[in-house]
């Protein structure tokens, strides 16, 4: 089952007696919203995810759908450049990047996941064509063919 992020105070962390733990520990950042960027070598799709209220904590993945808002997000050219540079340095040709826009108006990198969730973007923004981009990339690598039909991959 899914276990989302948990807020731990520094003192609690110091008191733990666990020798090894499969976890990632990051400082808590007060956020305005989250940014998710699905990045192929030659293309990307991105969104901004914001809470409609503060009632559900800090992980939108466990909120009821009506409690968050998904909007298009236009990253800067420099941000896309840096993401591509990271993909190249990790020898990846695809990755899903997560960022937080802090209340201090700084953008904070959280992670890049080579198998991250991004297909939901098409549910909110069909014009993003992430299914099309993914299928083209899987079939053609960098040689994107706009004529490949997504329809032939749907099961009735």
Language model segments and positions:
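Short loop/turn microsegments at loop-to-beta-strand junctions
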Residues: 34-35, 95-97
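Phosphate-binding site of ATP-dependent enzymes
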Residues: 1-74
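C-terminal active-site "lid" helix and adjoining low-complexity regulatory extension at the edge
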Residues: 69, 73-77, 81, 85-92, ...
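A short catalytic or substrate-binding loop motif that flags glycine-/basic-rich loops and adjacent residues
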Residues: 28-31, 89-93
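Homeobox/homeodomain signature
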Residues: 15-19, 84, 97
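Protein kinase-like catalytic core scaffold
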Residues: 24, 45, 95, 108-111
């Amino acid at each position: 089952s899914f276990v989302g992020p948990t807020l731990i105070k520094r003192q609690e962390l110091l008191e733990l007696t666990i020798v090894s733990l499969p976890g990632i520990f990051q400082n808590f950042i007060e956020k305005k919203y989250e940014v998710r960027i699905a990045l192929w070598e030659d293309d990307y799709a991105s969104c901004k995810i914001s809470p409609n209220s503060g009632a559900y904590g800090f992980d939108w993945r466990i909120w009821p759908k009506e409690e968050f808002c998904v909007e298009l997000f236009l990253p800067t050219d420099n941000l896309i450049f840096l993401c591509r540079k990271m993909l190249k340095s990790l020898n990846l040709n695809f990755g899903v990047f997560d960022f937080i826009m802090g209340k201090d108006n700084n953008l904070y990198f959280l992670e890049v996941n080579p198998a991250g969730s991004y297909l939901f973007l098409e549910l909110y923004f069909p014009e993003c064509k992430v299914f099309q981009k993914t299928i083209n990339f899987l079939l053609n690598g960098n040689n994107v063919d706009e004529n490949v039909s997504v329809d032939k991959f749907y099961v009735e």
